[in-house]
């Protein structure tokens, strides 16, 4: 498990560009994430598409992605919706908009009718981001519990930087801090973005075999532990930034 965690750190820090203007990615400050199970995926995707197309919501241009989850080793969640906010005020606006939306009420009814079950909610904030994830369709995520940030973060950054020259590196990565919803079992999430599941699997096959990862594993031993991991494939996206 530690190997997976360490590996995720390595590949994440491969592209070094900060968002200074709109020609570069404008990453969110806060991410509101909702995990759920859906036994009828086509119905759930259709209902979500209809919700986001409703006038009172579409006019707000909220940045949101609906993901299908694979190989989730933690619970029975099959999908995740992530809303991305640049400011706390935008987060508040979204809450007010959805709570007053008739379309959202219809969406919840539609979900209940096909057996949707809510599994978890988290609020995260980006601590580190790098690269350009716009247009990517697959994301590998590791949820981790960091007991020694002073050891973990520099080691992760060193590993990721060292892996930049590998041809199978991710297009972008981020380290998120869990603000709410962690239930005491995790402190951070690491994500890496790829153009396709094929690229994601190619990365997973190779990154933990590198000498850089082996050195990283030894360095962070006892400082971080893996909670869960999964691959998230985009099935709906609105207003990417």
What are these model-derived regions, one by one?
Residues 4-13:
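Sec-dependent N-terminal signal peptides
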Residues 13-19:
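Sec/Tat signal peptide C-region and signal peptidase I cleavage site
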Residues 19-215, 219-241:
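Short S/T/G/P-rich N-terminal loop/turn motif that feeds into the first structured element of a domain
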């Amino acid at each position: 498990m530690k190997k997976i965690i360490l590996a995720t750190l390595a590949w994440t820090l491969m592209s070094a560009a900060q968002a200074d203007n709109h020609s570069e990615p404008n990453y969110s400050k806060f991410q509101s994430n909702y995990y759920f199970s859906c036994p009828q995926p086509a119905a759930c995707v259709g209902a979500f598409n209809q919700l986001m197309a409703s006038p009172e919501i579409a006019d707000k241009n909220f940045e949101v992605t609906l993901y299908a989850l694979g190989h989730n080793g933690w619970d029975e969640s099959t999908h995740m919706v992530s809303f991305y906010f640049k400011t706390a005020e935008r987060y508040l606006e979204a809450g007010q908009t959805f709570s007053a939306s008739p379309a959202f009420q219809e969406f919840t009814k539609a979900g209940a009718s096909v057996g949707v079950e809510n599994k978890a909610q988290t609020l995260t904030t980006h601590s580190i981001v790098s690269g350009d994830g716009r247009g990517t369709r697959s994301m590998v995520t590791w949820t981790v519990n960091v007991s020694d940030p002073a050891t973990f973060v520099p080691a992760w950054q060193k590993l990721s930087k060292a892996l930049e020259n590998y041809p199978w590196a991710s297009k972008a990565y981020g380290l998120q801090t869990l603000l709410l919803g962690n239930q005491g079992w995790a402190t951070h999430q690491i994500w890496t973005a790829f153009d396709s599941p094929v690229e994601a699997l190619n990365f997973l096959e190779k990154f933990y075999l590198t000498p850089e990862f082996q050195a990283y594993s030894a360095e962070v031993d006892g400082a971080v532990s893996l909670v869960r991991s999964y691959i998230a494939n985009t099935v709906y996206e609105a207003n990417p930034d």
